[in-house]
Amino acid sequence: MPGCDTGANPLGWTQDAGLIGLPQPVLLHWSPKSPFVRKVVIVLDECGLTSQVERRRTVADRLRPDPAYLQRHPLGTIPMLELDDGSILYDSAVICEYLTIIRPTPALLPRAGRARFDVLRRQALADGMLDAILLWRQERIRPPAQQSTAFHAAYALKARTALDALAAEAAQWPEALDLGQIAAGAALAYLDLRFPDLAWRDGRNGLAGWHDRFEARPSAAANRLVLD
């Protein structure tokens, strides 16, 4: 099975027996509550890199950002990956692309051509839907008197439109897992936990069936969202 593109090791990462590996040590700032973090740890698992990464539980509070963390990551979000040379990688899309380059794996991100950009676009759709959902959740937890009816209507429409687009595509998704599918799986799992009233599965049986199969994968089952 084709692997991720290792290229000519242009960044100088270590190679052993023809495989490009992670520099050591590597630190992932994470939380089991973040769907974007979940996307990264599923990719780590699929790439066989989980044991090479130290995890540090990090709180990324939107209203009370940690000044020390902001010095390393100006946006203060998670996930963030710290490499041994002090380099910092964020956000989840950048981290995932890095992981698919440094370690051969079933081709989560094709090397080139239309197939590559199909996967990147699918990831962008899933991540964009998740960004919208997270903003919508912030509106939902405001005091009822301060909530905007127009905001709710707009973001409900965005969520439904994105879900319909994913549902329309799901039947044509390749059998082999790719990065765009991982992003979609992480976003849909978050909807199950935080937005059960959205009932995204209703009328989208194909997408729902795909998601059930995704969640049964060992990499997904080992990295469930935990909303403590």
Where are these regions (language model features)?
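Short, flexible helix/strand-to-coil boundary loops that buttress conserved ligand/catalytic motifs
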Residues: 41, 93, 134, 195, ...
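Short, hydrophobic secondary-structure boundary micro-motifs
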Residues: 106-111, 199-201, 221-226
